[in-house]
Design a protein with these regions (language model features):
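Bacterial Sec-dependent signal peptides at the C-terminal "C-region" and cleavage site
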Residues: 14-22
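Acidic Gly/Asp/Thr-rich repetitive segments characteristic of extracellular carbohydrate-active
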Residues: 25-60
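Extracellular beta-strand-rich solenoid/capping regions of secreted or surface-exposed proteins
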Residues: 43, 47-52, 68-103, 112-131, ...
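The right-handed parallel beta-helix/beta-solenoid scaffold, focusing on the short coil/turn
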Residues: 58, 92, 100-102, 109, ...
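Ser/Thr/Gly-rich low-complexity blocks that favor extended beta-strand/coil architectures
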Residues: 113, 162-208, 355-394
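Short glycine/acidic-rich loop motifs that flank beta-strands on beta-rich extracellular proteins
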Residues: 113-119, 139-143, 243-246, 266-272, ...
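Small/polar beta-strand repeat architecture
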Residues: 198-242, 377-379, 387-429, 437
Length: 602
């Protein structure tokens, strides 16, 4: 009798957990708003569900509420994540792996993480959707303080530490700490207290974290000289580590992220690599609204796509308070380290935060770049075979032995500086109807040869350049050249209030070319900028380097006096090695003087 009762209860539990093609996670013991550790329960539930799902579409439902995730009992994974610190293992809150035709619906839930964790991973999936939830950390690794007094003569600042920040004064140093981590910050970003915009002309600042004294509860007196930090200014103390993004995608096909808000992550909001066809629909990296006491979101980019293909569609998002771009799209050059024979090279990932993940597959089309001039050398080729040269397989590898279908140009070897670019893993991009505001560094960055459309966005006080087209085989080794870019119907409001890398104008076309004078061809091409509105307090609107084919037409440039002009570039247009330029039918406050407003260099 007792056995029958147990079996009956088990059947009821299983029926409750999966009903009508839907898995209700409450059937796996998950309960909202308890403060209890959800990590082991969700890990077990997702593992069981992954083993059961077939080709039919299923939904995984998380009852609405707050769920807390701790490192204890979390899924442990060894992930090598592009543009992040390669420390392992990663402790994953929700690990979606090898799933097909799955919809995860958080139903408005808040996922709150503790310590140092990777909140969500989606790996090896096909036709999956994640939607309706937010990601945050109870104690972010960024420390926020508010300036109370600034003695500019004595070089002393008194500041108050935000109530959620955990810290101690150790040997007269401010040390931020949390569950399983601590750091002594040296750098920060200053925000206006009332607007949450970056303070004008401050950029990255040193912070008063050394030789300090706690003069009252959470009130610190520090030797710190910076006259721009008036009382009421909010400063975030940050580091430059980026162990994990908020959402990690790898080897996924046809993915949708819908109505998701990332309020904080220690790395990027989203990092997707080697994935195909990604839709972001109202995916945001944002504060919790106007009344959120925080001024920051992520430690790095809001969204980042490395070595992806198909279509990246990002629409309807809000990106604010992050420490870098709202979106960055690129591939990765391998540096040629050895020529084995006329068809075989050894290529290597060169940046310490970008290695360990798959680079290419047999059949992929590639081309070769001379790094100093960023010119294509020889003809396109195809990968015949590829294997890791320094690891048993590609997992964790830095070097790859690549055999090509056709002989490689004899000039390409370890003698010189050459890069290998994978043209197969390059996406089209549609970035539209987004708001990008009050962030550090830049608004957006695109480096793909496929069609890129940037339209109907608002770039509001992005602090540096609003849109950057790059390409770099010398530092980050991020590919590649743009050949079909349409920037239209966007509004740009007071970009360039600060100076950061590549911020030569509101729109900056800035490939890294160490030996520009020796370059014979052009890197970028096919760029059209039209029907946009620019509101600016300064002069530079468009900077371009090494471009063949650039159109700037039907744009409106309105001048204001919101800040003093200070940029070193005092030309509306500054061109270096740019040909086939068309500037016409634009409206400028105060008129346009071609001789004065255009600077062109060969």
């Amino acid at each position: 009798m007792k056995l029958n009762s147990v079996l009956t209860l088990l059947f009821i539990a299983l029926f409750t957990a999966c009903k009508g093609g839907a898995y209700d996670l409450s059937g796996y013991g998950l309960k909202p708003d308890t403060g209890e550790n959800a990590s082991p329960l969700i890990a077990k539930a997702l593992q069981e569900i992954a083993a059961e799902v077939n080709s039919d579409t299923v939904r995984i439902l998380l009852p609405k509420g707050r769920y807390d995730f701790y490192p204890e009992g979390a899924s442990k994974r060894e992930y090598f994540i592009s543009n992040h610190d390669q420390d392992n293992p990663k402790l994953v809150g929700l690990a979606f792996e090898n799933m097909k035709n799955v919809i995860f619906d958080g139903q408005g839930s808040e996922l709150v993480f503790h310590g140092r964790m990777l909140p969500v991973s989606l790996v090896g999936s096909e036709n999956c959707t994640l939607k309706n939830f937010s990601i945050d950390f109870a104690n972010p690794h960024i420390s926020q303080v508010k300036v109370l007094e600034n003695d500019t003569v004595g070089g002393l600042i008194t500041y108050e530490v935000a109530p959620w920040v955990e810290y101690e004064i150790r040997d007269s140093n401010f040390v931020a700490k949390g569950e399983g981590w601590e750091h002594a910050p040296a750098w920060g970003i200053a925000f206006e207290g009332d607007t949450k915009r970056l303070v004008y002309a401050t950029s990255d600042i040193s912070v008063g974290s050394k030789h300090v004294a706690e003069i009252a509860s959470r009130k610190i007196l520090a030797p710190w000289k910076n006259k721009k930090l008036i009382p009421g200014t909010v400063v975030v103390f940050r580091g430059y580590g980026r162990p994990t993004p908020g959402v990690f995608m790898y080897h996924d096909t046809n993915t949708t992220l819908e109505n998701i808000q990332v309020h904080y992550a220690e790395g990027m909001g989203l990092l997707a690599q080697m994935s195909e066809n990604i839709t972001l629909d109202k995916f945001s990296v944002c504060l919790r609204g106007k009344d959120d006491p925080r001024y920051f979101t992520t430690q790095a980019d809001a969204t980042h796509f490395s070595g992806c293909k198909g279509l990246i569609r990002s629409v309807g998002g809000l990106y604010e308070g992050m420490m870098d771009d709202a979106i960055n799209v690129h591939g990765t050059y391998l540096k040629v380290q050895k020529r084995i024979d006329n068809k075989t090279l050894v290529g290597e990932y060169m940046h310490g935060q970008s290695y360990g993940f798959e680079w290419g597959r047999p059949g992929d089309v590639v081309q070769f770049i001379e790094s100093k001039t960023m010119e294509v050398l020889g003809e396109q080729n195809k990968v015949a075979a590829i294997e890791a040269a320094d690891k048993p397989d590609g997992h964790g590898a830095k070097q790859f032995r690549i055999t090509f279908e056709k002989p490689v140009d004899p000039a390409i070897s370890e003698v010189g500086t050459y890069g290998i670019e994978n043209l197969e893993w390059t996406p089209e991009v549609y970035f539209a109807d987004n708001v990008i505001r009050n962030n550090r560094a830049r608004g957006s960055l695109f480096s793909t040869p496929k069609k890129t459309v940037v339209e109907k966005n608002v770039f509001d006080h992005t602090s540096g350049t609003a849109i950057l087209l790059c390409g770099d085989c010398n530092g980050w080794f991020e590919t590649g050249a743009c050949h079909d870019v349409h920037i239209r119907n966007n509004k740009f409001i007071n970009a360039l209030t600060n100076q950061f890398q590549f911020t030569n104008a509101v729109i900056s076309i800035y490939p890294e070319i160490p030996d520009l004078k020796s370059q014979k061809r052009y890197f970028h091409s096919g760029i059209v900028i039209e029907d946009n509105e620019f509101e600016t307090f300064d002069m530079p609107i468009l900077y371009a380097k090494s471009v063949d084919g650039l159109v700037f037409r039907n744009n409106v440039i309105r001048q204001n006096h919101d800040y003093p002009a200070f940029h070193w570039n005092n030309h509306r247009f500054f061109f270096q090695r740019v040909v086939n330029v068309e500037i016409k039918d634009n409206r400028f406050d105060g008129g346009f003087d071609e001789e004065k407003d255009i600077r062109s260099e060969e």
